[in-house]
Amino acid sequence: MAKEIKFSDSARNLLFEGVRQLHDAVKVTMGPRGRNVLIQKSYGAPSITKDGVSVAKEIELSCPVANMGAQLVKEVASKTADAAGDGTTTATVLAYSIFKEGLRNITAGANPIEVKRGMDKAAEAIINELKKASKKVGGKEEITQVATISANSDHNIGKLIADAMEKVGKDGVITVEEAKGIEDELDVVEGMQFDRGYLSPYFVTNAEKMTAQLDNAYILLTDKKISSMKDILPLLEKTMKEGKPLLIIAEDIEGEALTTLVVNKLRGVLNIAAVKAPGFGDRRKEMLKDIAILTGGQVISEELGLSLENAEVEFLGKAGRIVIDKDNTTIVDGKGHSDDVKDRVAQIKTQIASTTSDYDKEKLQERLAKLSGGVAVIKVGAASEVEMKEKKDRVDDALSATKAAVEEGIVIGGGAALIRAAQKVHLNLHDDEKVGYEIIMRAIKAPLAQIAINAGYDGGVVVNEVQKHEGHFGFNASNGKYVDMFKEGIIDPLKVERIALQNAVSVSSLLLTTEATVHEIKEEKAAPAMPDMGGMGGMGGMGGMM
C-alpha cells in the first residue's frame, strides 16, 4: 500500500490538531465542577463519564496524522492512570499546553533539541520542589479526603475506601464489584493476593479490564513444571464432569500443555486459567502450602509421594471467586477450614519471632498479611447500568489514587501544587534551553486555569490571585473561595502530580522533535457500477400516460 509522508511544520501542525481535539474533549471533565461526556457504544446504552481516561480511550480521528498525535497523548493518559490511578486529565491538559507553547517557539526558529533539554531540566526541578512540599498521609481523615477528591467529590466513596483501608491495612487487598441493590456496601472476606498474572491473555473473561474471573472454582496446586497435556488430562476430565472452572497454579506451564489449554478455553470446552506459582525455591513451596490451607486443597508434589496423573478432585482447593490480571492473582472466599488457617498464621508468627534475618522477616510478614488480612470488597450500588459503570470507574480511580497518596505522600490540590513548586524554581539557563524552561513555567498554570474555567470562573484571574500568595493558599472551585487547601482537605497525591508532569513532558518532547510522519493512503473504494438498463427500452412507451 502507498504511503504519504509529511514533513516539519506541516507534520507538527497536523499532530497538534489531533492533540487539540483530544484535549478539548477531555479538559471539560476536570475539577469538582467538571462536566460529563456522553460516549456512544457499539452496543447497548451510551455511557456517561467524568473520567478523563475513559473519554480519551474512545477517541479515534479520521485524519491519520492528527490521529497519531491524539493516540500518543491518549497513551500518556492511560499510563498515568495505570501508574497513579488519577491525573489523566492533568497529564492531557499539561501535554497540550506544553506542545502548544513549544510549537509556537519551534515554528519561530528555536532548536527543538535545546528546547527539550530545557523542558526536562525545568520539570525535574519542579518535581524536586513538589517532593519537598509533600507530607505523609496521616490518619483516616486524610485518606477519606484524597479518595473523595479522586472520586469527583463523592464523600460516600471516600469514606468507603478509608473504611476498607482501615480494615485490611494500607497494604491490604481491596477489590471493587457491583452490588445487587442501589446501596454501596463494604465486605471483608478471607482472601489472598500474589504477584503472578495469567500465563496467556487468552484466559481473559473481561476484555475491557483484561481480567480473568472464575467463580466457585477449583484450584490445582503443584510445584511441578507442566509441559505435557497427559500429565493433567485425567484431572481435567474429572473437573469437567463437575462443571466448575479450574485455576492451575504450577511452577510453570509451557509448550503443548499451555497451547492445548488455550485452544480448549477459546472453543469453550474448558473454563480455565493458569498462573505460575509465586515466590522462588523454598519460599515458593511455603506459599503454595499457604494457598492450599486457605482453599482446603493439597499441594501435589513428588516429595509428598503425589503425582498429577493419579491426583483426585479431593486434592483440589476451592474458592468462591478468583480474579486474575496481567500482574496479580486474587483468591477470595477460600474454602479451607478456619482452624487450619489460624494454625498456619500462628506458625508464621513463631517463625517471625525466631528469625534473625530482616529479609526473611519481611517476607514472612508479607505471607502473614496475605493469610490473615483478608480482602476488602467494595460493592458499588446504582439505579441503572450506565450509572453503575460510571460509578465503578470512579471508585477504581479513587482507590488507586489513595494507594498512591499513602505510598508517596500528598500535596495541595486544585492545580496549586505545580504553581507553588514552580515559584521556588530558578534555573540559570541560556538561549533555547531557557525557552524550554519558560514553556514549562507557563504550561504548569493550565490545570488550575482549566479547573476554574469548568467551574465558571476566569482562569487567568484565578491563576494570578493564587500566584500572589505562598504556602497552602489555593482556589476551591466548589464554592469559588480562596482557602488554605490543606485545612479544606483539597489535596492530591504527590505521585499523581509527579507522573502527570513527567508523562506530559515526555510526550510533548517527542511531538516537538518529530520532523516527519509516515502514514498509509486510504484507497477510495470505487462506487458500484450502475446496472445495465439496455433491456428496459420499452419504457419509452410510457409517454402516453401524460
UniProtKB/Swiss-Prot annotation:
Protein role: Together with its co-chaperonin GroES, plays an essential role in assisting protein folding. The GroEL-GroES system forms a nano-cage that allows encapsulation of the non-native substrate proteins and provides a physical environment optimized to promote and accelerate protein folding.
Location (main, coarse): cytoplasm
GO molecular function: ATP binding; ATP-dependent protein folding chaperone; isomerase activity; unfolded protein binding
Recorded family membership: Belongs to the chaperonin (HSP60) family.
PROSITE patterns membership: CHAPERONINS_CPN60 (PS00296)
InterPro entries found in the cross-reference section: Chaperonin_Cpn60_CS, Cpn60/GroEL, Cpn60/GroEL/TCP-1, GroEL-like_apical_dom_sf, GROEL-like_equatorial_sf, TCP-1-like_intermed_sf
Quaternary structure and partners: Forms a cylinder of 14 subunits composed of two heptameric rings stacked back-to-back. Interacts with the co-chaperonin GroES.
Taxonomy, superkingdom: Bacteria
Enzyme class: isomerase
Compartments where found: Cytoplasm
EC number, UniProt record: 5.6.1.7
UniProt KW keywords: ATP-binding, Chaperone, Cytoplasm, Isomerase, Nucleotide-binding, Stress response
The protein, known as: Chaperonin GroEL
Binding site for ATP: T29, M30, G31, P32, K50, D86, G87, T88, T89, T90, G414, D492
